[in-house]
Curated annotation (Swiss-Prot):
Residues passing through the membrane, by range: 14-34
Function: May be involved in cell wall biosynthesis. May act as a fucosyltransferase.
Main location, first listed in the record: Golgi
Localization: Golgi apparatus, Golgi stack membrane
UniProt KW keywords: Cell wall biogenesis/degradation, Glycoprotein, Glycosyltransferase, Golgi apparatus, Membrane, Signal-anchor, Transferase, Transmembrane, Transmembrane helix
Taxonomic superkingdom: Eukaryota
Gene designation per UniProt: FUT5
UniProt family annotation: Belongs to the glycosyltransferase 37 family.
Residue spans, topological domain Cytoplasmic: 1-13
Protein name: Probable fucosyltransferase 5
Ranges per topology, Lumenal: 35-533
Protein backbone atom coordinates (compact mmCIF):
# COMPACT_ATOMS: atom_id res chain seq x y z
CA UNK A 1 0.00 0.00 0.00
CA UNK A 2 2.76 2.42 0.96
CA UNK A 3 4.57 1.87 -2.42
CA UNK A 4 1.53 3.06 -4.34
CA UNK A 5 2.10 6.57 -3.00
CA UNK A 6 5.84 6.71 -3.90
CA UNK A 7 6.98 8.90 -6.80
CA UNK A 8 10.47 8.26 -8.23
CA UNK A 9 12.96 11.13 -8.32
CA UNK A 10 13.49 10.68 -12.07
CA UNK A 11 9.83 11.32 -12.82
CA UNK A 12 9.68 14.35 -10.58
CA UNK A 13 12.70 15.92 -12.29
CA UNK A 14 11.06 15.71 -15.69
CA UNK A 15 7.93 17.51 -14.52
CA UNK A 16 7.43 21.21 -14.86
CA UNK A 17 7.23 23.56 -11.88
CA UNK A 18 3.43 23.76 -12.02
CA UNK A 19 3.09 20.01 -11.93
CA UNK A 20 5.47 19.80 -8.96
CA UNK A 21 3.36 22.31 -7.07
CA UNK A 22 0.19 20.44 -8.00
CA UNK A 23 1.59 17.16 -6.70
CA UNK A 24 2.79 18.78 -3.49
CA UNK A 25 -0.61 20.37 -2.86
CA UNK A 26 -2.47 17.16 -3.71
CA UNK A 27 -0.26 15.07 -1.43
CA UNK A 28 -0.63 17.56 1.41
CA UNK A 29 -4.40 17.59 0.93
CA UNK A 30 -4.48 13.79 1.04
CA UNK A 31 -2.58 13.74 4.33
CA UNK A 32 -4.97 16.36 5.75
CA UNK A 33 -8.03 14.36 4.69
CA UNK A 34 -6.66 11.19 6.25
CA UNK A 35 -5.83 13.03 9.46
CA UNK A 36 -9.28 14.64 9.51
CA UNK A 37 -10.96 11.30 8.90
CA UNK A 38 -9.08 9.62 11.74
CA UNK A 39 -10.05 12.34 14.17
CA UNK A 40 -13.58 13.00 12.93
CA UNK A 41 -15.35 11.33 15.84
CA UNK A 42 -13.29 13.21 18.41
CA UNK A 43 -13.96 16.51 16.65
CA UNK A 44 -17.67 15.70 16.54
CA UNK A 45 -17.69 15.14 20.28
CA UNK A 46 -15.80 18.38 20.88
CA UNK A 47 -18.18 20.32 18.63
CA UNK A 48 -21.20 18.95 20.42
CA UNK A 49 -20.01 19.98 23.85
CA UNK A 50 -18.97 23.42 22.55
CA UNK A 51 -16.86 23.94 25.64
CA UNK A 52 -15.07 27.27 25.92
CA UNK A 53 -11.65 27.82 27.50
CA UNK A 54 -13.05 28.78 30.89
CA UNK A 55 -15.19 25.63 31.02
CA UNK A 56 -12.25 23.34 30.27
CA UNK A 57 -10.43 24.74 33.30
CA UNK A 58 -12.97 23.03 35.57
CA UNK A 59 -11.88 19.67 36.99
CA UNK A 60 -13.42 16.99 34.81
CA UNK A 61 -15.65 14.45 36.55
CA UNK A 62 -17.62 12.91 33.72
CA UNK A 63 -18.63 9.95 35.90
CA UNK A 64 -20.17 12.24 38.57
CA UNK A 65 -18.37 10.77 41.55
CA UNK A 66 -18.76 7.24 40.24
CA UNK A 67 -22.51 7.55 39.70
CA UNK A 68 -21.99 6.67 36.02
CA UNK A 69 -20.06 3.75 34.62
CA UNK A 70 -17.38 4.29 31.99
CA UNK A 71 -18.59 1.27 29.98
CA UNK A 72 -20.33 3.25 27.22
CA UNK A 73 -19.18 4.69 23.91
CA UNK A 74 -19.36 8.48 24.25
CA UNK A 75 -20.52 9.13 20.71
CA UNK A 76 -23.60 6.91 21.02
CA UNK A 77 -25.06 9.17 23.71
CA UNK A 78 -23.26 12.50 23.96
CA UNK A 79 -25.28 13.78 26.89
CA UNK A 80 -24.23 10.96 29.23
CA UNK A 81 -20.70 12.26 29.82
CA UNK A 82 -21.02 15.83 28.50
CA UNK A 83 -23.88 17.22 30.61
CA UNK A 84 -21.29 18.15 33.19
CA UNK A 85 -19.73 20.83 31.00
CA UNK A 86 -22.92 22.89 30.73
CA UNK A 87 -23.46 23.26 34.47
CA UNK A 88 -21.82 26.40 35.81
CA UNK A 89 -20.89 24.68 39.07
CA UNK A 90 -20.48 20.98 39.86
CA UNK A 91 -23.30 19.62 42.00
CA UNK A 92 -22.44 19.92 45.71
CA UNK A 93 -24.35 16.68 46.26
CA UNK A 94 -22.09 13.66 45.94
CA UNK A 95 -23.43 10.11 45.59
CA UNK A 96 -22.65 7.81 48.50
CA UNK A 97 -20.16 4.99 47.99
CA UNK A 98 -22.94 2.60 48.90
CA UNK A 99 -25.18 3.94 46.11
CA UNK A 100 -22.34 3.66 43.59
CA UNK A 101 -21.66 0.06 44.65
CA UNK A 102 -25.36 -0.79 44.52
CA UNK A 103 -25.68 0.60 40.99
CA UNK A 104 -22.72 -1.45 39.73
CA UNK A 105 -24.27 -4.59 41.26
CA UNK A 106 -27.61 -3.78 39.67
CA UNK A 107 -25.99 -3.35 36.25
CA UNK A 108 -24.54 -6.86 36.48
CA UNK A 109 -27.92 -8.25 37.55
CA UNK A 110 -29.69 -6.52 34.67
CA UNK A 111 -27.14 -7.83 32.19
CA UNK A 112 -27.67 -11.36 33.48
CA UNK A 113 -31.48 -11.20 33.51
CA UNK A 114 -32.36 -8.64 30.82
CA UNK A 115 -34.18 -9.19 27.52
CA UNK A 116 -32.95 -12.01 25.26
CA UNK A 117 -31.26 -13.86 28.13
CA UNK A 118 -32.16 -17.41 29.10
CA UNK A 119 -33.38 -16.21 32.48
CA UNK A 120 -35.75 -13.76 30.80
CA UNK A 121 -37.12 -16.44 28.47
CA UNK A 122 -37.65 -18.77 31.41
CA UNK A 123 -39.50 -16.06 33.33
CA UNK A 124 -41.73 -15.33 30.32
CA UNK A 125 -42.77 -18.98 30.17
CA UNK A 126 -43.94 -18.81 33.79
CA UNK A 127 -46.37 -16.00 32.97
CA UNK A 128 -48.76 -18.49 31.42
CA UNK A 129 -49.05 -20.53 34.62
CA UNK A 130 -51.83 -20.02 37.13
CA UNK A 131 -49.58 -20.33 40.14
CA UNK A 132 -45.99 -19.30 40.81
CA UNK A 133 -45.66 -20.90 44.24
CA UNK A 134 -43.25 -23.62 43.13
CA UNK A 135 -40.24 -21.42 42.38
CA UNK A 136 -39.40 -17.78 41.91
CA UNK A 137 -36.55 -18.49 39.55
CA UNK A 138 -33.32 -16.53 39.58
CA UNK A 139 -34.69 -13.27 38.18
CA UNK A 140 -37.73 -11.22 39.12
CA UNK A 141 -39.06 -8.28 37.13
CA UNK A 142 -40.99 -5.05 37.40
CA UNK A 143 -42.53 -3.58 34.24
CA UNK A 144 -43.12 0.16 34.02
CA UNK A 145 -46.16 0.98 31.87
CA UNK A 146 -45.98 4.40 30.19
CA UNK A 147 -48.77 6.89 30.69
CA UNK A 148 -49.55 10.57 31.22
CA UNK A 149 -47.21 13.52 30.57
CA UNK A 150 -43.43 13.47 30.37
CA UNK A 151 -42.90 14.93 33.85
CA UNK A 152 -45.06 12.20 35.39
CA UNK A 153 -43.22 9.55 33.41
CA UNK A 154 -39.77 10.59 34.53
CA UNK A 155 -40.84 10.83 38.17
CA UNK A 156 -42.46 7.41 38.10
CA UNK A 157 -39.54 5.84 36.22
CA UNK A 158 -37.20 6.98 38.98
CA UNK A 159 -39.63 5.71 41.64
CA UNK A 160 -39.98 2.29 40.03
CA UNK A 161 -36.23 1.99 39.51
CA UNK A 162 -35.55 2.75 43.17
CA UNK A 163 -38.09 0.12 44.18
CA UNK A 164 -36.34 -2.32 41.81
CA UNK A 165 -33.00 -1.44 43.40
CA UNK A 166 -34.38 -2.11 46.90
CA UNK A 167 -36.02 -5.41 45.97
CA UNK A 168 -33.44 -6.70 43.46
CA UNK A 169 -35.88 -6.76 40.58
CA UNK A 170 -35.13 -6.02 36.93
CA UNK A 171 -36.84 -2.90 35.62
CA UNK A 172 -38.19 -3.15 32.08
CA UNK A 173 -39.66 -0.11 30.36
CA UNK A 174 -42.75 -0.10 28.16
CA UNK A 175 -41.49 1.19 24.82
CA UNK A 176 -44.79 1.50 22.95
CA UNK A 177 -44.57 5.25 23.43
CA UNK A 178 -41.45 7.30 22.65
CA UNK A 179 -38.99 6.38 25.40
CA UNK A 180 -36.23 5.35 22.99
CA UNK A 181 -36.65 8.63 21.07
CA UNK A 182 -36.05 10.58 24.26
CA UNK A 183 -33.58 8.68 26.42
CA UNK A 184 -30.46 6.60 25.89
CA UNK A 185 -30.06 3.17 27.45
CA UNK A 186 -28.87 3.60 31.06
CA UNK A 187 -27.38 0.13 31.67
CA UNK A 188 -24.26 -1.10 29.81
CA UNK A 189 -24.29 -4.23 27.67
CA UNK A 190 -28.05 -4.75 27.85
CA UNK A 191 -31.40 -2.99 27.37
CA UNK A 192 -34.08 -1.72 29.69
CA UNK A 193 -36.70 -1.72 26.91
CA UNK A 194 -39.42 -4.30 27.28
CA UNK A 195 -39.65 -6.42 24.11
CA UNK A 196 -42.76 -5.54 22.11
CA UNK A 197 -43.88 -9.17 22.11
CA UNK A 198 -44.26 -9.19 25.90
CA UNK A 199 -47.53 -11.15 26.34
CA UNK A 200 -49.09 -8.92 29.02
CA UNK A 201 -49.04 -5.83 26.79
CA UNK A 202 -51.20 -7.18 24.00
CA UNK A 203 -54.24 -5.29 22.74
CA UNK A 204 -56.61 -6.86 25.26
CA UNK A 205 -54.80 -5.44 28.26
CA UNK A 206 -53.07 -2.38 26.80
CA UNK A 207 -55.57 0.01 28.38
CA UNK A 208 -57.18 -2.52 30.69
CA UNK A 209 -54.86 -2.03 33.64
CA UNK A 210 -56.99 -0.40 36.31
CA UNK A 211 -58.43 -1.10 39.74
CA UNK A 212 -60.85 -3.62 38.23
CA UNK A 213 -58.08 -5.69 36.65
CA UNK A 214 -58.39 -9.25 38.10
CA UNK A 215 -54.85 -9.24 39.47
CA UNK A 216 -54.73 -5.68 40.74
CA UNK A 217 -52.94 -6.00 44.08
CA UNK A 218 -54.97 -3.32 45.88
CA UNK A 219 -58.27 -4.98 44.93
CA UNK A 220 -57.03 -8.47 45.81
CA UNK A 221 -55.77 -7.17 49.14
CA UNK A 222 -59.13 -5.60 49.99
CA UNK A 223 -60.94 -8.82 49.06
CA UNK A 224 -58.38 -11.00 50.88
CA UNK A 225 -58.07 -13.04 47.69
CA UNK A 226 -54.29 -13.36 47.80
CA UNK A 227 -52.13 -15.19 50.31
CA UNK A 228 -48.75 -16.87 50.66
CA UNK A 229 -50.10 -20.29 49.70
CA UNK A 230 -51.26 -19.21 46.26
CA UNK A 231 -48.80 -16.89 44.52
CA UNK A 232 -49.88 -15.51 41.12
CA UNK A 233 -47.28 -15.31 38.31
CA UNK A 234 -47.87 -11.56 38.04
CA UNK A 235 -49.54 -8.69 39.85
CA UNK A 236 -50.65 -5.28 38.65
CA UNK A 237 -49.74 -2.35 40.91
CA UNK A 238 -52.09 0.63 40.47
CA UNK A 239 -50.37 3.81 41.67
CA UNK A 240 -52.22 6.65 39.98
CA UNK A 241 -53.93 9.78 41.27
CA UNK A 242 -57.12 7.76 41.86
CA UNK A 243 -55.42 4.97 43.83
CA UNK A 244 -56.79 3.74 47.14
CA UNK A 245 -54.68 3.35 50.28
CA UNK A 246 -54.71 -0.39 49.58
CA UNK A 247 -52.90 0.39 46.30
CA UNK A 248 -50.50 2.95 47.74
CA UNK A 249 -49.40 0.91 50.75
CA UNK A 250 -47.99 -2.00 48.76
CA UNK A 251 -44.66 -0.77 50.14
CA UNK A 252 -45.50 -1.91 53.70
CA UNK A 253 -43.59 -4.79 55.29
CA UNK A 254 -46.50 -7.24 55.48
CA UNK A 255 -47.42 -6.57 51.85
CA UNK A 256 -43.84 -6.90 50.67
CA UNK A 257 -43.42 -10.31 52.31
CA UNK A 258 -46.05 -11.58 49.86
CA UNK A 259 -45.29 -9.41 46.83
CA UNK A 260 -41.63 -10.41 47.04
CA UNK A 261 -42.58 -13.93 45.92
CA UNK A 262 -44.33 -12.80 42.72
CA UNK A 263 -42.05 -13.12 39.64
CA UNK A 264 -43.61 -10.28 37.63
CA UNK A 265 -44.96 -6.91 38.76
CA UNK A 266 -46.61 -4.56 36.28
CA UNK A 267 -46.78 -0.96 37.48
CA UNK A 268 -48.79 1.92 36.13
CA UNK A 269 -48.13 5.16 37.96
CA UNK A 270 -48.26 8.92 37.51
CA UNK A 271 -46.96 9.99 40.93
CA UNK A 272 -43.56 10.16 42.62
CA UNK A 273 -44.12 7.57 45.35
CA UNK A 274 -40.54 7.54 46.72
CA UNK A 275 -41.45 9.19 50.08
CA UNK A 276 -43.72 6.26 50.98
CA UNK A 277 -40.86 3.77 50.58
CA UNK A 278 -39.38 5.17 53.79
CA UNK A 279 -42.42 3.92 55.74
CA UNK A 280 -41.08 0.36 55.43
CA UNK A 281 -38.40 -0.16 58.17
CA UNK A 282 -36.42 -2.59 56.00
CA UNK A 283 -36.42 -0.20 53.07
CA UNK A 284 -35.62 2.74 55.35
CA UNK A 285 -32.46 1.04 56.67
CA UNK A 286 -31.25 0.58 53.10
CA UNK A 287 -32.36 4.03 51.93
CA UNK A 288 -30.43 5.81 54.69
CA UNK A 289 -27.23 4.14 53.44
CA UNK A 290 -28.03 4.88 49.79
CA UNK A 291 -29.02 8.50 50.39
CA UNK A 292 -27.48 10.01 53.54
CA UNK A 293 -28.78 13.34 52.20
CA UNK A 294 -32.44 12.46 51.87
CA UNK A 295 -33.37 15.29 49.52
CA UNK A 296 -30.95 13.99 46.86
CA UNK A 297 -32.89 10.87 45.85
CA UNK A 298 -34.29 12.10 42.54
CA UNK A 299 -31.24 14.29 41.85
CA UNK A 300 -28.94 11.25 41.87
CA UNK A 301 -31.34 8.81 40.21
CA UNK A 302 -32.19 11.23 37.40
CA UNK A 303 -28.53 11.93 36.64
CA UNK A 304 -27.90 8.19 36.55
CA UNK A 305 -30.95 7.11 34.53
CA UNK A 306 -31.90 9.94 32.21
CA UNK A 307 -29.57 10.80 29.33
CA UNK A 308 -31.22 12.59 26.38
CA UNK A 309 -30.64 11.09 22.96
CA UNK A 310 -28.27 12.90 20.61
CA UNK A 311 -31.22 14.45 18.77
CA UNK A 312 -32.58 15.95 21.99
CA UNK A 313 -29.13 16.90 23.25
CA UNK A 314 -28.52 18.91 20.07
CA UNK A 315 -31.61 20.97 20.94
CA UNK A 316 -30.26 21.60 24.43
CA UNK A 317 -26.72 22.59 23.42
CA UNK A 318 -27.79 24.71 20.45
CA UNK A 319 -30.27 26.73 22.48
CA UNK A 320 -27.98 27.01 25.49
CA UNK A 321 -25.06 28.40 23.50
CA UNK A 322 -27.29 30.72 21.45
CA UNK A 323 -29.15 32.31 24.37
CA UNK A 324 -27.87 31.37 27.83
CA UNK A 325 -24.14 30.72 27.82
CA UNK A 326 -22.99 34.36 27.83
CA UNK A 327 -25.25 35.54 30.65
CA UNK A 328 -23.81 36.58 34.01
CA UNK A 329 -26.82 34.97 35.66
CA UNK A 330 -29.60 32.69 34.46
CA UNK A 331 -33.11 32.48 35.87
CA UNK A 332 -35.54 29.73 34.96
CA UNK A 333 -39.29 30.33 35.15
CA UNK A 334 -41.63 27.41 34.52
CA UNK A 335 -45.33 28.23 34.35
CA UNK A 336 -48.08 25.63 34.35
CA UNK A 337 -51.65 26.87 33.99
CA UNK A 338 -54.16 24.32 35.24
CA UNK A 339 -57.51 24.28 33.48
CA UNK A 340 -58.40 26.53 30.55
CA UNK A 341 -57.00 30.05 30.97
CA UNK A 342 -59.33 31.53 28.32
CA UNK A 343 -56.77 34.23 27.65
CA UNK A 344 -56.71 35.41 31.26
CA UNK A 345 -52.98 35.58 32.00
CA UNK A 346 -52.60 38.92 33.78
CA UNK A 347 -52.92 37.49 37.30
CA UNK A 348 -50.23 34.91 36.48
CA UNK A 349 -47.86 37.53 35.06
CA UNK A 350 -48.49 39.71 38.12
CA UNK A 351 -47.72 36.73 40.36
CA UNK A 352 -44.46 35.95 38.55
CA UNK A 353 -43.31 39.58 38.71
CA UNK A 354 -44.35 39.86 42.36
CA UNK A 355 -42.45 36.70 43.30
CA UNK A 356 -39.28 37.33 41.32
CA UNK A 357 -38.91 40.96 42.39
CA UNK A 358 -39.79 40.30 46.03
CA UNK A 359 -37.19 37.52 46.17
CA UNK A 360 -34.59 39.66 44.33
CA UNK A 361 -34.48 37.23 41.40
CA UNK A 362 -35.36 40.00 38.95
CA UNK A 363 -34.61 43.70 39.46
CA UNK A 364 -37.26 46.29 40.20
CA UNK A 365 -38.13 48.75 37.45
CA UNK A 366 -36.16 51.98 37.67
CA UNK A 367 -37.67 55.32 38.55
CA UNK A 368 -36.79 58.21 36.18
CA UNK A 369 -34.10 59.37 38.64
CA UNK A 370 -32.58 55.89 38.99
CA UNK A 371 -32.42 55.37 35.24
CA UNK A 372 -30.13 58.40 34.96
CA UNK A 373 -27.82 57.26 37.77
CA UNK A 374 -27.50 53.54 36.98
CA UNK A 375 -25.47 53.83 33.82
CA UNK A 376 -22.75 51.19 33.54
CA UNK A 377 -20.22 50.63 30.79
CA UNK A 378 -20.46 46.88 31.38
CA UNK A 379 -23.98 46.17 32.65
CA UNK A 380 -24.72 42.76 34.07
CA UNK A 381 -26.64 40.45 31.73
CA UNK A 382 -29.40 38.30 33.16
CA UNK A 383 -31.00 35.71 30.86
CA UNK A 384 -34.49 34.54 31.78
CA UNK A 385 -35.62 31.20 30.37
CA UNK A 386 -39.40 30.77 30.34
CA UNK A 387 -40.93 27.33 29.87
CA UNK A 388 -44.67 27.28 29.27
CA UNK A 389 -47.27 26.18 26.76
CA UNK A 390 -48.25 29.83 26.37
CA UNK A 391 -45.98 32.37 24.61
CA UNK A 392 -47.83 35.27 26.26
CA UNK A 393 -45.70 34.93 29.40
CA UNK A 394 -42.33 35.57 27.78
CA UNK A 395 -43.92 38.21 25.56
CA UNK A 396 -45.20 40.16 28.55
CA UNK A 397 -41.89 39.93 30.40
CA UNK A 398 -39.97 41.01 27.31
CA UNK A 399 -42.19 44.05 26.85
CA UNK A 400 -41.81 45.05 30.48
CA UNK A 401 -38.02 44.91 30.59
CA UNK A 402 -37.45 46.31 27.10
CA UNK A 403 -39.54 49.41 27.75
CA UNK A 404 -38.46 50.10 31.33
CA UNK A 405 -34.84 50.03 32.55
CA UNK A 406 -34.04 48.09 35.70
CA UNK A 407 -33.21 49.79 39.00
CA UNK A 408 -29.87 47.96 39.15
CA UNK A 409 -28.80 48.75 35.59
CA UNK A 410 -28.95 45.06 34.68
CA UNK A 411 -29.96 44.03 31.18
CA UNK A 412 -32.74 41.43 31.30
CA UNK A 413 -33.25 39.26 28.22
CA UNK A 414 -36.19 36.85 28.09
CA UNK A 415 -36.30 33.66 26.02
CA UNK A 416 -38.95 30.99 25.53
CA UNK A 417 -37.97 27.97 23.39
CA UNK A 418 -41.55 26.94 22.56
CA UNK A 419 -45.18 27.78 23.21
CA UNK A 420 -47.41 25.12 21.70
CA UNK A 421 -50.51 26.01 23.76
CA UNK A 422 -51.68 22.39 23.92
CA UNK A 423 -49.89 19.52 25.64
CA UNK A 424 -49.29 16.86 22.98
CA UNK A 425 -48.17 13.87 25.02
CA UNK A 426 -46.83 10.95 22.94
CA UNK A 427 -46.06 13.18 19.97
CA UNK A 428 -42.34 12.68 19.40
CA UNK A 429 -41.38 16.26 18.55
CA UNK A 430 -43.42 17.69 21.44
CA UNK A 431 -41.94 15.33 24.02
CA UNK A 432 -38.42 15.94 22.72
CA UNK A 433 -38.88 19.71 23.10
CA UNK A 434 -40.29 19.17 26.60
CA UNK A 435 -37.30 17.08 27.65
CA UNK A 436 -34.88 19.62 26.18
CA UNK A 437 -36.59 22.41 28.13
CA UNK A 438 -36.41 20.45 31.38
CA UNK A 439 -32.66 20.18 30.91
CA UNK A 440 -32.33 23.84 29.96
CA UNK A 441 -34.20 24.83 33.13
CA UNK A 442 -31.89 22.61 35.17
CA UNK A 443 -28.92 24.64 33.86
CA UNK A 444 -30.13 27.90 35.40
CA UNK A 445 -28.75 29.46 38.58
CA UNK A 446 -32.16 29.98 40.19
CA UNK A 447 -35.57 28.63 39.30
CA UNK A 448 -39.22 29.51 39.86
CA UNK A 449 -41.82 26.82 39.14
CA UNK A 450 -45.57 26.37 39.37
CA UNK A 451 -47.13 24.47 42.24
CA UNK A 452 -48.03 20.84 41.55
CA UNK A 453 -46.14 20.79 38.24
CA UNK A 454 -44.30 17.53 37.59
CA UNK A 455 -42.47 19.32 34.74
CA UNK A 456 -41.11 21.76 37.30
CA UNK A 457 -40.30 19.03 39.82
CA UNK A 458 -38.09 17.22 37.30
CA UNK A 459 -36.34 20.42 36.21
CA UNK A 460 -35.27 21.79 39.58
CA UNK A 461 -34.39 18.43 41.13
CA UNK A 462 -32.33 17.45 38.09
CA UNK A 463 -30.34 20.67 38.51
CA UNK A 464 -29.95 20.30 42.27
CA UNK A 465 -31.88 23.55 42.82
CA UNK A 466 -34.18 24.53 45.66
CA UNK A 467 -36.98 26.33 43.81
CA UNK A 468 -39.32 29.17 44.51
CA UNK A 469 -42.76 27.59 44.21
CA UNK A 470 -45.60 29.70 42.81
CA UNK A 471 -48.78 29.09 44.77
CA UNK A 472 -51.69 27.98 42.64
CA UNK A 473 -54.01 30.95 41.90
CA UNK A 474 -57.71 30.77 42.72
CA UNK A 475 -60.48 32.70 40.97
CA UNK A 476 -57.96 34.31 38.58
CA UNK A 477 -56.36 36.35 41.38
CA UNK A 478 -52.72 36.65 42.41
CA UNK A 479 -51.97 34.80 45.68
CA UNK A 480 -50.43 36.71 48.57
CA UNK A 481 -47.67 35.78 49.20
CA UNK A 482 -47.08 34.82 45.56
CA UNK A 483 -44.49 32.11 46.21
CA UNK A 484 -42.46 30.22 48.78
CA UNK A 485 -38.83 29.06 48.74
CA UNK A 486 -38.70 25.29 49.11
CA UNK A 487 -36.47 23.79 51.78
CA UNK A 488 -35.93 20.69 49.65
CA UNK A 489 -35.14 19.95 46.03
CA UNK A 490 -37.12 16.70 46.08
CA UNK A 491 -40.33 16.32 44.04
CA UNK A 492 -43.66 16.11 45.83
CA UNK A 493 -45.70 12.90 46.08
CA UNK A 494 -48.98 14.60 45.18
CA UNK A 495 -51.48 11.92 46.24
CA UNK A 496 -49.87 9.93 49.08
CA UNK A 497 -51.56 7.45 51.44
CA UNK A 498 -53.49 9.09 54.25
CA UNK A 499 -51.70 7.06 56.91
CA UNK A 500 -48.68 4.86 57.44
CA UNK A 501 -47.95 1.14 57.63
CA UNK A 502 -48.84 -1.34 60.39
CA UNK A 503 -47.86 0.45 63.65
CA UNK A 504 -48.52 3.85 62.07
CA UNK A 505 -51.90 2.89 60.61
CA UNK A 506 -53.76 5.62 62.50
CA UNK A 507 -51.11 8.33 62.05
CA UNK A 508 -51.25 11.08 59.44
CA UNK A 509 -48.70 10.13 56.77
CA UNK A 510 -47.07 13.57 57.01
CA UNK A 511 -46.31 13.13 60.71
CA UNK A 512 -44.79 9.65 60.84
CA UNK A 513 -41.17 10.53 60.07
CA UNK A 514 -39.49 13.90 60.74
CA UNK A 515 -37.96 13.94 57.25
CA UNK A 516 -41.15 12.96 55.37
CA UNK A 517 -43.50 15.92 55.61
CA UNK A 518 -46.22 17.66 53.65
CA UNK A 519 -45.26 19.67 50.56
CA UNK A 520 -45.05 23.47 50.62
CA UNK A 521 -46.97 23.95 47.38
CA UNK A 522 -50.14 22.13 48.49
CA UNK A 523 -52.67 23.42 50.98
CA UNK A 524 -53.43 19.88 52.10
CA UNK A 525 -51.56 16.65 51.62
CA UNK A 526 -48.61 15.73 49.51
CA UNK A 527 -45.42 14.19 50.89
CA UNK A 528 -41.84 15.24 50.38
CA UNK A 529 -38.38 14.33 51.68
CA UNK A 530 -36.50 16.97 53.66
CA UNK A 531 -33.09 17.22 55.27
CA UNK A 532 -33.99 20.38 57.18
CA UNK A 533 -36.21 19.59 60.17
Amino acid sequence: MYQKFQISGKIVKTLGLKMKVLIAVSFGSLLFILSYSNNFNNKLLDATTKVDIKETEKPVDKLIGGLLTADFDEGSCLSRYHKYFLYRKPSPYKPSEYLVSKLRSYEMLHKRCGPDTEYYKEAIEKLSRDDASESNGECRYIVWVAGYGLGNRLLTLASVFLYALLTERIILVDNRKDVSDLLCEPFPGTSWLLPLDFPMLNYTYAWGYNKEYPRCYGTMSEKHSINSTSIPPHLYMHNLHDSRDSDKLFVCQKDQSLIDKVPWLIVQANVYFVPSLWFNPTFQTELVKLFPQKETVFHHLARYLFHPTNEVWDMVTDYYHAHLSKADERLGIQIRVFGKPDGRFKHVIDQVISCTQREKLLPEFATPEESKVNISKTPKLKSVLVASLYPEFSGNLTNMFSKRPSSTGEIVEVYQPSGERVQQTDKKSHDQKALAEMYLLSLTDNIVTSARSTFGYVSYSLGGLKPWLLYQPTNFTTPNPPCVRSKSMEPCYLTPPSHGCEADWGTNSGKILPFVRHCEDLIYGGLKLYDEF
